Amino acid sequence: MAYPFQLGLQDATSPIMEELTNFHDHTLMIVFLISSLVLYLISLMLTTKLIHTNTMDAQEVETVWTILPAIILIMIALPSLRILYLMDEINNPVLTVKTMGHQWYWSYEYTDYEDLCFDSYMTPTNELKPGELRLLEVDNRVVLPMELPIRMLISSEDVLHSWAVPSLGLKTDAIPGRLNQATITSNRPGVFYGQCSEICGSNHSFMPIVLEMIPLKLFENWSTSMI
């Protein structure tokens, strides 16, 4: 999860988030090199008094600054396209969870079970227990098995919402009348926090998301106790 004065991204918990982190570093390095070159050229222009008065054209330079940006854009586009396809790919999910956005809470339905559904509201500040996080805790967590592909079906009952969990690399719009899907695969157990990431009204800031990833055996015990 995020912490005060954090400079980097949240720790990656899913393969997709690991890919996104690597792509961020790859792109940032390219931007850093380009920025350094531009600053170097600007410093040369400000410090030198020499002027090429006889230079009317420079075909070699024009060729370089046409081809080089194209190569750089390709170096950015290819990894980006790969990640886009990976994010859309869903192979044999073991579980499907339907998520509905409301003003201002989330409801969840485990479609593989006959009667396993619940609403998830933010825990008020005056009801928090020691060690719990303000504006991030909920009364009912989404419990899921770790290391297994899980399909999330996301929609909304009223206005636009966005279901986002940064450490899993997830952000999917919840749109009324439309069903979007995303894949979750957690590499490790833990509790992961997210929030609604689309301004949806006066209580937009009070729609937290809490995922609890546990081993499959513990998930089976939990689902049995909930039915």
Swiss-Prot record:
Residues that coordinate or bind Cu cation A2: C196, E198, C200, H204
Cofactor(s) it depends on: Cu cation
Pfam families assigned to the protein according to its UniProt record, in alphabetical order: COX2 (PF00116), COX2_TM (PF02790)
Cofactor remark from the record: Binds a dinuclear copper A center per subunit.
Residues binding Cu cation A1: H161, C196, C200, M207
Domain of life: Eukaryota
Localization terms from the record: Mitochondrion inner membrane
Residue ranges of the TM segments: 15-45, 60-87
Protein name per the record: Cytochrome c oxidase subunit 2
Organism field: Gerbillurus vallinus
Taxonomy of the source species: Eukaryota, Metazoa, Chordata, Craniata, Vertebrata
Gene name for this UniProt entry: MT-CO2
